[in-house]
Structures are given as structure tokens and as C-alpha cells.
Amino acid sequence: MVFSDQQLFEKVVEILKPFDLSVVDYEEICDRMGESMRLGLQKSTNEKSSIKMFPSYVTKTPNGTETGNFLALDLGGTNYRVLSVTLEGKGKSPRIQERTYCIPAEKMSGSGTELFKYIAETLADFLENNGMKDKKFDLGFTFSFPCVQKGLTHATLVRWTKGFSADGVEGHNVAELLQTELDKRELNVKCVAVVNDTVGTLASCALEDPKCAVGLIVGTGTNVAYIEDSSKVELMDGVKEPEVVINTEWGAFGEKGELDCWRTQFDKSMDIDSLHPGKQLYEKMVSGMYLGELVRHIIVYLVEQKILFRGDLPERLKVRNSLLTRYLTDVERDPAHLLYNTHYMLTDDLHVPVVEPIDNRIVRYACEMVVKRAAYLAGAGIACILRRINRSEVTVGVDGSLYKFHPKFCERMTDMVDKLKPKNTRFCLRLSEDGSGKGAAAIAASCTRQN
């Protein structure tokens, strides 16, 4: 039986209907996340929660008065940065020198010693090239992986995410592993704070906006940090300060089954093929590391159903992670009547030999549905945080490639926050670029205030 283009498209709409959640669905997800966060903050129920709500031990966020020269390391994905940040006080933007290094695959999956040796070597290289090797520095280390913190310089890695699997690091204090390698090279550098990139994003935004109480990352991964009332944090003993920044690690939401009724067949098949099946399920529905792969799984299925590409799957699309999330950003820049980016992606990037107009339309729709759900899920998460802190006015500092570069992600996320937030709360999403660099340096600068 031969189907018309419109019939094929209608079949795709039906197949992808599970991605099209209602506001009631997102309300329920928001409620479930709130309950997971409540459980995560209590000692007696933390094990029952998929969201671990780690105290960051940052009890004073920067206020813009900090001054001095500090170093920051930013490790949170395949690209790793070394920064020199000069803070010049109120009203002045920090001066930043930085260099980006690509972490070799063998360092990501080899030994932890080799990974931290590489980090120390690149830091030494940076200092040498900038004439700073003989100077003394305090350093803020942005380490964007799930950690249990017992202090600003005691962060134990719970588990690797985002493609890392270096052994000998899980269960160990990453500040100590870093400091050991720095000391071996006789660098006059002291790691004074380990922070998550979301904590850094919050701190960076707080330098310029005192209403900032939330830091959000939507990039390779996703996570959020926020300022919590210390009296509600049982996980942290003997807190004297009234507030503490919580690193939620919300990417793990769903690991206790909270998202099962909304996970599609494609979410499940992608998860099974992933490096850590059953883990980081919310992150796998929201973040840039997974959305392209999710679309690839959809395309493979549609080819198997003889809906796409005349049933012929190109070799390139048989390869895991061959469909990059940045392609999704390009695709949604296309006007609805002229899908030239979509066509280019399929023909030039993915080597599909024959692409019909209906193929472009279907692939564009799949990309749109996947990213739309991701943005709405992120929005439901932010609404959950706003409900929790219940302030009249809140700035959310946001960073991450998906948020920054996708043409519709911010708009969609904002739309869902608006629908689910407390009625008496006004919020503002503010781009907080370089939070993991500038923010980590600012926290290093403010450490003396809280010690």
C-alpha cells in the first residue's frame, strides 16, 4: 500500500504523540520533583530520593565587592578550561584570560591519576604561557559531576556522568586528587573551593544581580543549584549561617520510577544503549548530550517502518551519537516553508543519499517534538524550585549551549515556568555566561568571608 505524504506525516504525529505532554502532565512532574527534593534534604529519607540535594557548603554568595586575582578550573564535559580571573569590585566587570583544552578520550576513560595529571599539566602550561608561574594563587575548581561535599575542599565523587569513566576517582575527594598533582609540579596554587557548575552559575549571576537565587545549566548535561534555608537541610550538621546553596543533581530525577509513565519507547531504547543505563533519566530527556541521539533512535524506527528514506537506513545513522544535538538547533532555525538546514543536515552531515521533501518535514517535526519536551521539562523543574523557595522576586542565572544557542528553548522553557510557578512570584531568566569560570573564582574570593 502506498501512502501519500500527508498520510505519512500523520502516522509520524501519532507515533510521536507520547512526546506531546499536557500542562497537567508537567504539573504532576513538577509535584513529583518537589517531593523528591523534600525527601532528598532529609537524612532519614535521602536514600528514597533520586534527587540527592547535596549541600555545597557555600553559605555566602558573592556580592560584587570581591577583589583580587584568582584561578579557576572548569571540568564538566569534553572541553576543559583554565582561567585567570581578576575581580575589581563593585561596578567593574572581571578581567578574564582563559584557554580551552580538549580532554582526550583515553583520559576520560583511563585512570583517575592520568586525568588529574593532565589537568595539572595544562594548568602549568597556562601559567607558563601567561607569565604567572611564580605567582601564588587561590583556585576555585568547578567540577560538574555528582559529589557529596563535607566542606568547600572536600568533594567526593559519587559517580561519573557525561561520558567519563576514569577509574580511581569515584568515592575519592577530587580536591585532594587535584592538589596532589599540583603539588607534584611545585605549583604555588591552592584549591580553596570545589563547586558545581550550577553553583558557579548562581555565584556569577549574583555578582551582578542580588536577586539571583537559582543557577541552572542546560548544556551537555543539566543541573540546578539554589539558595535554601539552612534549617531545612538535615544533611549538613552544625550550620551557623541562615542559608546554604544546594546542588540538587536533578539530572538523576526519574531513577526511582518518577518519570516512567512519561518515558517513551525511544527514551527507553536510547537509555539501554547509553553508557549508564537506568541513570540520569531526567537529564537524558532534557540535556544536549542526549537529544540528538534520541532523535536518531526515532529516525531509525521510522526507517524500519518504511516511513523515512524509503526504508533505507544510511550507514552514518547506524552509528551511535552520529546525530549531534547542534544539528537540532540548526534544524529549528529553518522557516516552516523552507527546510534548507534540515536538508543539509541529512544530505551533507548524515550522508542520506536521497532526501524527499516529506523526509525533511518529518525529521524537522521529530527534532521539534524532542526539544519542545526538553524545554518544557526544564521549565517544570524551575517552577518546582520557585515553589520551594517561595520568594516574591527571583532571578535565575542560566548557562549552557542548549539554552544559549537553540532559537526556541528559552521561550518554551519560560512559557512552562509561567504556567506552573507560584502566582505571587516574579521571575527573570538571565544569561549567566562563564559561571563555571567567573563564578568559581568569585567563590574562591569569598571563601575567607565564610571561613
UniProtKB/Swiss-Prot annotation:
Q: Which controlled-vocabulary keywords does the entry list? A: ATP-binding, Glycolysis, Kinase, Nucleotide-binding, Transferase
Describe its function: Catalyzes the phosphorylation of various hexoses to hexose 6-phosphate.
Question: Which reactions are catalysed by this chain?
Answer: a D-hexose + ATP = a D-hexose 6-phosphate + ADP + H(+); D-mannose + ATP = D-mannose 6-phosphate + ADP + H(+); D-fructose + ATP = D-fructose 6-phosphate + ADP + H(+); D-glucose + ATP = D-glucose 6-phosphate + ADP + H(+)
Subunit structure of this chain's protein: Monomer.
Q: Which GO terms describe its biological process?
A: glucose metabolic process; glycolytic process; intracellular glucose homeostasis
Kindly provide the name given to this protein in its UniProt entry: Hexokinase
Domain of life here?
A: Eukaryota
Q: In which pathway does it act?
A: Carbohydrate metabolism; hexose metabolism; Carbohydrate degradation; glycolysis; D-glyceraldehyde 3-phosphate and glycerone phosphate from D-glucose: step 1/4
Enzyme Commission number: 2.7.1.1
Gene Ontology MF term list: ATP binding; D-glucose binding; fructokinase activity; glucokinase activity; mannokinase activity
PANTHER family xref list: HEXOKINASE, HEXOKINASE TYPE 1-RELATED
Belongs to which family? Belongs to the hexokinase family.
Q: Give the span(s) annotated as Hexokinase large subdomain.
A: 196-434
Species, as recorded: Schistosoma mansoni (Blood fluke)
Q: Which PROSITE patterns match?
A: HEXOKINASE_1, HEXOKINASE_2
| Residues annotated as binding substrate | 144, 161-162, 196-197, 222-223, 249, 283
Record carries keyword Ligase? no
Where does the chain bind ATP?
74-79, 288-289, 325-329, 401-405
A matching Pfam family: Hexokinase_1
Region listing for Hexokinase small subdomain, in residue ranges: 63-195
Q: Name one GO cellular component term.
A: mitochondrion
Q: Which residues form the Hexokinase domain?
A: 6-445
